[in-house]
């Protein structure tokens, strides 16, 4: 066959007359002269693709379930490239080379542009129908296996110009945690408490008189608010505080639902059958999320939730001995409270310790919060009213704490409902030195004993020595080694916790920790922190980039990686608005980034036609990616073993946009990681492609032991030679070890195997040390945040040539073995969530920039005289055919030589259309009459070429 016929009909045309055609284009009704684009909010009502109308930050975590299956737009490009590799290997070796199919499997799994499609399937004539706003495409089911959408976010036509060539960069940066807004961690009086004045005294030396309260300047039962006069006196220890529970408005409905379950349980003679543990868990999870973090990262609560449900069943059983103690008749006890008492005991047993607001599991902290609404300070009341004590198997400190009351809880400033002027407690976090004045000769070794600082964090020599001995004897213990264990308890910021350290003592007097309102200097992290009062300056905003307090943490997405102690901040993806909108305003982060003094200079590195004033999200993300590259290379250059002995002083790590120029264009974080080794150890300036870089990292991560070393030797021979030396004698010999974490910590489609663990890092201070850098899901430690600021310290020229100490030398073998065996990034990911967001981001981008343009793309195989493809696309006419053809070609980065022809059909608002062809394809548009119906037909010809059969693509996809 050398000719293909595609009828173009209207909705009035009887489709039975064209049911035998392989492809039919059905035009939608004509639209008016005022037509300006598509209303994408109607996508959920059409058979297009699975995007819901929801807040954009919810949408990026949405699991597509309302669809008929998924399609991978680049599957043909990958399959053909794999076929070519297979063919070449057979010619060279005479046998199949097994890794090419493994490569294809990996490419499919690694893809981030999977499309969850909603289609109509017509059983009467076996066709699949794909909807667009401008037309419908009917495809014979035998030929529908490669059909996909090819939508475009149009570039704005006014003001600064967009650059929508590589729009996947936005999704990529977000998945790598490189597009986040930040708010400092914040604490308030628990909104589940009403704190009132119970008594007052003149000086802290006086005793509060039991049974004879006095009120000097305050009123009896006067409520205490952060920042008011009552609070100021409370902070000075002059007020005895009474704690009562209260229900915050935000969870009033959930508490009412719990009360209804409670009342039914009481009326039903306390039978356990009235306690639906799953229902309770769901309500408590909702409370936990609403009160602490509405958009926390999803955690796999399934196992813990089941344990909690079993504990609830046990605790509400009538034969439970502890329940019977709770039910003993004593004054102040009542059935209404007993319900919440049993619930929080079950939560505590599930957690095997006291539950706090900061508990990572919403259902457990929800149980605590719900109980606080009724009981006030839960554990104090359990001990004093219900004679229940925390178990001896809990943490030892929990036993002491049940005699005290804890009145502050951590809240998320992104969600906090607070008016300007409201007082809160927050953590101020600053870098001690944003830029160091250094020289190559002197290096930048950490000063662990700074002159300034009210409180200074210090290493504990005994604990450090114990860790070193463990490494020598047993190897690197990634689950056991913790940085907080390496520091002295006094002034240890990794042990600070305002929720646990601000309390009411046994006489209900407020006690603040000694570090409150004091700067703690943490030289090993180049940080100083201080908890103090601050005023809220902005109301809650839909834009997460808006700073809430008068003294916020200020850093852009890349600079944030230098703030090592992530527990003192909260992060949120810097997106605002909804998933589907015709026009909306983006987050102000783009304006802020475009004002960066180095914006134009950094973007100029790309040697692309960019508008250096553009606030287009794609341009700002390209800026961030280039800045990320420069910061990593500026930092790690000093960890390469070779360095000139130069006494010239300079600022470090000051970014110089003219440095580290490459041959090639940067599109992916994986390119940065791979080029680190190429640049410094292999002396290559050429930037590997995205696919090659991701493949290299995959091979390294999926191998282990000697096999991993072989993979390193294959791609980075000079680096691997450095790992193979027989004896590490000098400091310079071990400097390459700090490059190893970069192979494992980043990725847009990975999840860490462990929730929290530590990797070894060489640390340069007055002596060479080995320290555990903590990685994991807690405290936002994803990517390079866990190690980057530690890398700001590097040895002097003389230190590089010094002999290693015996203890460090003895640890190098175990450290190398750890990095050759570790499987950091082998955690399970929700592939259907991670890989299906390309359509979402393109649609969201269209609402910010120039609008939404749609297309459907499919392919036909050519079998003779050479095997190749032609692409066919039907689209709206909102952009030029030339741009659309360029977009089609970009789907074939690996096998573009096999795409021999393109047919591009553009449908105008008035429902006329035009056809453009390229390559081996020619076309004619003719009129066709069938009975009383008349339509257009597009005759597509490939002179000298023969179309392949229906299953040629199937065979290709199953090589």
Swiss-Prot record:
One of the protein's GO biological processes: clathrin-dependent endocytosis of virus by host cell
Keyword Transmembrane helix: no
Domain of life: Viruses
Keyword annotations of the record: Capsid protein, Clathrin-mediated endocytosis of virus by host, Host-virus interaction, Inner capsid protein, Viral attachment to host cell, Viral penetration into host cytoplasm, Virion, Virus endocytosis by host, Virus entry into host cell
Cell location: Virion
Cystine connections: none
GO molecular function: structural molecule activity
Alphabetical list of InterPro entries matching this protein: Capsid_VP2_Orbivir
CC annotations in GO: viral inner capsid
Family label: Belongs to the orbivirus VP2 family.
Function: The VP2 protein is one of the two proteins (with VP5) which constitute the virus particle outer capsid. It is the major target of the host immunogenic response. Responsible for viral attachment to target host cell, probably by binding to sialic acid. This attachment induces virion internalization predominantly through clathrin-dependent endocytosis.
The protein's name in its UniProt record: Outer capsid protein VP2
Annotated gene: Segment-2
């Amino acid at each position: 066959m050398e000719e293909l016929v595609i009828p173009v009909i209207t909705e009035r045309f009887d489709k039975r007359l064209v049911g035998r055609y392989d492809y039919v284009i059905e035009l939608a009704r004509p639209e008016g002269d005022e037509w300006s684009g598509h209303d994408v909010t109607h996508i959920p009502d059409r058979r297009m693709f699975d995007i819901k109308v929801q807040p954009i930050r919810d949408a990026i975590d949405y699991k597509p379930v309302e669809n008929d299956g998924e399609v991978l737009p680049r599957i043909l490009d990958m399959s053909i490239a794999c076929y070519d590799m297979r063919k070449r290997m057979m010619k060279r070796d005479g046998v199949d080379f097994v890794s090419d199919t493994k490569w294809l499997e990996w490419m499919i799994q690694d893809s981030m542009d999977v499309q969850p499609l909603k289609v109509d399937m017509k059983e009467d004539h076996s066709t699949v129908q794909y909807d667009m706003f401008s037309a419908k495409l009917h495809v014979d089911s035998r030929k529908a296996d490669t059909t996909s959408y090819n939508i475009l976010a149009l570039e704005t036509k006014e003001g600064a110009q967009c650059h929508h060539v590589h729009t996947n960069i936005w999704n990529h940066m977000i998945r790598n945690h490189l597009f986040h807004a930040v708010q400092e961690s914040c604490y308030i009086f628990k909104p589940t408490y009403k704190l009132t004045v119970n008594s007052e005294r003149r000086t802290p030396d006086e005793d509060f008189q039991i049974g004879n309260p006095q009120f000097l300047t305050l009123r009896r039962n006067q409520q205490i608010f952060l920042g008011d006069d009552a609070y100021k006196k409370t902070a000075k220890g002059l007020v005895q505080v009474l704690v009562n529970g209260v229900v915050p408005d935000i969870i009033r409905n959930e508490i009412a639902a719990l009360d209804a379950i409670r009342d039914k349980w009481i009326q039903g003679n306390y039978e356990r059958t009235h306690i639906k543990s799953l229902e309770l868990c769901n309500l408590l999870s909702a409370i936990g999320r609403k009160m602490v973090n509405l958009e926390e990262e999803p955690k796999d609560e399934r196992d813990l939730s089941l344990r909690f449900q079993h504990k609830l069943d046990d605790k509400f059983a009538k034969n439970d001995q502890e329940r019977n103690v709770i039910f003993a008749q004593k004054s102040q006890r009542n059935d209404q409270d007993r319900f919440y008492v049993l619930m929080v005991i079950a939560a505590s047993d599930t957690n095997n310790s006291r539950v706090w607001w900061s508990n990572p599991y919403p259902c457990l902290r929800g149980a605590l919060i719900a109980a606080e609404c009724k009981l006030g300070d839960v554990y104090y009341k359990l001990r004093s009213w219900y004679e229940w004590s925390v178990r001896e198997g809990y943490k030892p400190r929990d036993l002491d704490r049940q005699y005290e009351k804890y009145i502050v809880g951590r809240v998320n400033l992104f969600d906090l409902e607070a008016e300007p002027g409201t007082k809160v407690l927050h953590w101020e976090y600053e870098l001690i030195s944003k830029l160091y004045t250094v020289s190559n000769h002197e290096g930048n070794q950490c000063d662990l004993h700074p002159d300034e600082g009210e409180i200074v964090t210090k290493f504990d020599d005994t604990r450090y020595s114990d860790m070193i001995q463990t490494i020598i004897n047993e190897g690197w213990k990634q689950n056991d080694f913790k940085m907080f264990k390496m520091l002295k308890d006094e002034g240890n910021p990794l042990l600070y916790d305002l929720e646990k350290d601000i309390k009411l003592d046994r006489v209900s007097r407020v006690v603040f920790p000694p570090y409150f309102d004091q700067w703690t200097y943490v030289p090993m992290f180049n940080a100083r922190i201080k908890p103090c009062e601050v005023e809220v300056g902005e109301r809650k905003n839909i834009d997460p980039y808006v700073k809430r307090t008068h003294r916020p943490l200020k850093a852009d997405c890349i600079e944030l990686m230098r703030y090592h102690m992530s527990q003192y901040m909260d992060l949120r993806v810097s997106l605002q608005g909804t998933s589907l909108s015709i026009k909306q305003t983006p987050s102000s982060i783009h304006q802020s980034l475009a004002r960066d003094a180095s914006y134009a200079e950094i973007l100029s590195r790309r040697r692309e036609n960019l508008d250096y004033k553009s606030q287009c999200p794609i341009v700002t993300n390209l800026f961030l990616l280039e800045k990320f590259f420069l910061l990593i290379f500026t930092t790690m250059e000093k960890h390469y073993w070779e360095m000139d002995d130069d006494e010239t002083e300079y600022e470090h790590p000051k970014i110089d946009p003219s440095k580290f120029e490459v041959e090639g264009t940067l599109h992916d974080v994986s390119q940065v990681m791979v080029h680190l080794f190429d640049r410094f150890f292999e002396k290559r300036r050429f930037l590997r492609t995205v696919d090659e870089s991701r493949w290299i990292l995959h091979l390294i991560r999926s191998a282990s032991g000697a096999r991993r070393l072989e993979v390193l030797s294959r791609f980075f021979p000079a680096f691997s030679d450095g790992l193979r030396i027989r004896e590490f004698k000098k400091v310079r010999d071990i400097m390459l070890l700090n490059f190893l974490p970069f192979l494992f910590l980043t990725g847009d489609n990975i999840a860490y195997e462990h929730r929290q663990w530590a990797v070894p890092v060489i640390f340069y201070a007055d002596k060479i040390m080995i320290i555990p850098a903590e990685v994991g899901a807690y405290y936002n430690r994803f990517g390079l945040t866990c190690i980057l600021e530690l890398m700001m310290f590097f040895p002097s020229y003389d230190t590089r040539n010094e002999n290693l100490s015996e203890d460090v030398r003895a640890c190098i073998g175990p450290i190398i073995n750890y990095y050759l065996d570790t499987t950091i990034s082998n955690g399970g990911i929700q592939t259907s969530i991670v890989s299906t967001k390309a359509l979402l981001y393109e649609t969201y981008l269209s609402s910010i920039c120039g609008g939404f343009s749609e297309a459907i793309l499919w392919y036909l195989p050519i079998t003779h005289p050479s095997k190749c493809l032609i692409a066919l696309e039907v689209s709206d006419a909102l952009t030029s055919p030339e741009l659309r053809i360029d977009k089609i070609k970009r789907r074939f980065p690996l096998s573009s030589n096999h795409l021999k022809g393109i047919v591009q059909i553009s449908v105008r608002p008035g429902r006329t259309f035009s056809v453009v062809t390229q390559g081996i394809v020619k076309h004619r548009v003719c009129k066709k009459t069938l009975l009383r119906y008349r339509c257009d037909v597009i005759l597509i010809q490939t002179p000298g070429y023969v179309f392949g059969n229906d299953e040629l693509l199937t065979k290709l996809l199953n090589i």
